[in-house]
């Protein structure tokens, strides 16, 4: 059996992806010269997208360690490889501190304005923001390193049990800091869970896409996926889609019935103009269509059909992040959205290079286990 992960053509492709990603990202950085605000807004979207995929892969892996099942064995090479991309998060975060004043209104708020909300004024300061970011990222790095170790068989479930709690807490708090505080007067008590559900869909869809796509092309030499495993993978993706829809709708319903101006304005900005159409697209393409498609037993058994569903959900994950972040900014949402897509593609080249490097290492390790 031929494993293309170590072939010269595979290495050449990896280098081309990295080169293209770096060039695209550097060209994106040139926007700093004439529109630094738009660049940092776009960069935040790209950072949240790729860091979310990395963290989502980690939570899926921890769930597998706790529950077991052959479905996890199918995705394990890519989930383990995604742990290596967690190491990219501190590097990708580096530009954000330089754009705090352009991203977050609270970073430049006056003392008089801060007096109206003293608790938020204490919490939302640039120094404390960066300290918390270092704590979150530090926890993620330690967790990724522990899960990457090949220790005793019983180690990973224990690490995963504690890791899930750490993950939920750190992602919830980081979602408040990095996204919710873009509009510092707005808040939602389940916002962190919304982001967790989105990250899970993005990471699971990407792992599924890579697994099936390589098998379709005959570039994966591991054992064939059985009908039961295919059904399990489809059902798990369906469950994640339903969970995302449930949490997202619950947040909307709570705010709708609360009918408080400081909460309702967040949805007004995201259901007006072009963002209203984006919201409808998310309802249809992120929930209704995948829900209908994943109800089909035949589709779950069809790798080609599942790659299409996974690709759709990855695109919707990006659109979801865009919808959560960009309406918080004052203007130029069209320009920022286009720039965000450009920077996301560039950052993706670097992310993919690291992932494929980890997959190449992981394959021999899997064969020995």
What are the functions of these language-model segments?
Residues 53-63, 90-96, 133-144, 197-212, ...:
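Hydrophobic cores of alpha-helical transmembrane segments in multi-pass inner/ER membrane proteins
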Residues 189-195, 262-283, 327-358:
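Membrane-interface transmembrane-helix boundary segments in multi-pass integral membrane proteins
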Residues 2-54, 121, 355-361, 369:
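N-terminal regions that are enriched for targeting/export leaders
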Residues 305-315:
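Central hydrophobic cores of alpha-helical transmembrane segments
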Residues 145-152, 215, 353-368:
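Membrane-interface capping segments at transmembrane-helix boundaries
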Residues 47-154:
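Transmembrane-helix bundle segments that line or gate the permeation/cavity pathway
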Residues 8-29, 120-282, 299:
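Long, contiguous internal "core" modules enriched in hydrophobic/ aromatic residues
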Residues 30-39, 177-185, 322-330:
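Juxtamembrane "helix-exit" motif on the non-cytosolic side of transmembrane helices
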